Curated annotation (Swiss-Prot):
The organism's place on the tree of life at top rank: Eukaryota
Comp. bias regions, Low complexity: 38-54, 69-79, 371-385
Residue segments, region Disordered: 29-79, 335-406
Signal peptide residue numbers: none
Transit peptide as recorded in UniProt: 1-18
UniProt-recorded name of the protein: Altered inheritance of mitochondria protein 23, mitochondrial
Family according to the record: Belongs to the AIM23 family.
Annotated localization: Mitochondrion
Gene it is expressed from: AIM23
Biological source species: Candida dubliniensis (strain CD36 / ATCC MYA-646 / CBS 7987 / NCPF 3949 / NRRL Y-17841)
Key words of the record: Mitochondrion, Transit peptide
GO cellular component, one term: mitochondrion
């Protein structure tokens, strides 16, 4: 029994040793790929990762080289802006309804000119490009407003246009003004629209009013002219033309220029002296020369008289033309101290007269009111008297009838 047990133990140990030997041999001989690539400390792996696997080295995130951005990417980042609000959606808590309506009209007009609402703002330092929403968000309608300037009618200083990236189009000009000015401009704009509608309908009253306005504007804009013939007498000049010149200077034409044209005739303005006396003399040169000399002397006297008159009126002038054909005096009247004192005195007198008239009107009104009150009182008294008389008569009739019954 003991021998059997010993043999069994030895046999089991031998089997274990044999199995362990087989496993070791199989691992060392059969799995050569594991022996080649499985060991982390093997030199072949280092060779494959560092040198052999070029794609791994090229596209590894850690070893990737940072390339510079293209121009398109840089421009795209520069163009990136924060979210811009549509100007039509901006609501104003300040200001009146008329101011809000005026700004809405300006926004609509800007949209017709520039649909992306890019504008040019007139500032003290010059023109600056803005988006309309940037200005509207910082605008206080109770104080300030906006003005859209037409480049066709504006001056050269304000019409300096610059081409931008928006296809080379000219941006609309805007100026910050007071609210009153904006409302006044909006009211004139509405009046013009109404007039155009009435003209389309064919109303005659609007046409007449427009004609009157145009005539007044032409009178204000045009320089006034006085025409003097060379053949005028000294008496006529002193009586007629001096009064015309004085009236023109006195009637509100203080600083404005006016022209004095000295001509032969209205029809023949530039007619020369040489052609005047040819038909009279009939080829006689001596008579013609004598007449021309006399005419020149007379014209010179007329010029001297006019110059002396202008010096009396404290005017400055510039002479253009020639005695032989035509002469024009470009006159600029200067307001003297005497005229200013007289005008101030006249204004004071007019103001005093206006005050007195107002006082008289007040006194007259008071008198009228007092008279009306007296008349009303008299009428009331007369009514009360008539009612009392009627009552007394009724009482007497009642007493009389009572006595008769008794």
């Amino acid at each position: 029994m003991s021998l059997r047990i010993i043999l069994k133990r030895d046999f089991s140990q031998c089997i274990r040793v044999f199995e362990s030997g087989i496993k070791s041999s199989t691992t060392t001989t059969s799995n050569r790929f594991q022996a080649q690539y499985g060991n982390k400390n093997n030199d072949n792996t280092k060779r494959n990762t560092n040198n052999g696997n070029r794609f791994h080295n090229k596209y590894n995130n850690e070893s990737r080289r940072s390339y510079p951005k293209t121009k398109y990417q840089q421009q795209y980042q520069q163009r990136k802006q924060p979210y811009i609000i549509d100007p039509r959606k901006i609501k104003f808590n300040n200001g009146t309804e008329s101011a809000r309506n005026a700004i809405e009209e300006i926004i609509n007009r800007i949209y017709k000119l520039q649909k992306n609402y890019q504008i040019q703002l007139i500032t003290n330092s010059g023109l600056k490009n803005y988006h309309l929403s940037e200005i509207l968000q910082n605008l206080d309608l109770s104080i300030n407003g906006l003005q859209l300037i037409d480049k066709s009618t504006s001056t050269t200083t304000t019409t300096t246009t610059t081409t931008t990236n928006n296809g080379g189009n000219e941006l609309p000009l805007i100026k910050i003004i007071t609210v009153r000015e904006m409302i006044n401009q909006y009211s004139t704009y509405l009046n013009n629209l109404k007039q155009l509608e009435l003209i389309k309908l064919g109303s005659l009253k609007t046409l007449k009013t427009l004609d009157i306005k145009l005539k007044l504007e032409q009178k204000k804009s045009t320089t006034k002219e006085i025409l003097i013939k060379w053949s005028i007498n000294n008496n006529d000049f002193k009586l007629q033309k001096t009064n015309e010149i004085k009236k023109l200077i006195g009637n509100g034409n203080g600083g404005k220029n006016f022209l004095i044209n000295m001509v032969y005739n209205k029809r023949n303005i530039n007619k020369s002296i040489d052609t005047i006396y040819k038909y009279q003399c009939k080829g006689d040169e001596i008579e013609e020369k004598n007449l021309i000399e006399i005419e020149l002397q007379r014209r010179q006297l007329l010029i001297n008289n006019l110059q002396s008159l202008l010096t009396e009126l404290n005017c400055k002038w510039i002479i253009e033309g020639d005695i032989n054909t035509k002469m024009t005096f470009n006159v600029t009247p200067s307001i003297s101290q005497s005229t200013t004192t007289t005008t101030t005195q006249e204004q004071e007198q007019e103001d005093y007269n206006d005050i007195e008239e107002k006082k008289l009107n007040r006194t007259e009104r008071k008198k009228r009111k007092s008279q009306q009150q007296q008349q009303q009182q008299q009428q009331q008294q007369s009514k009360t008297n008539t009612t009392k008389k009627d009552e007394d008569e009724e009482d007497l009739d009642a007493l009389y009838s009572f006595k008769i019954e008794d």
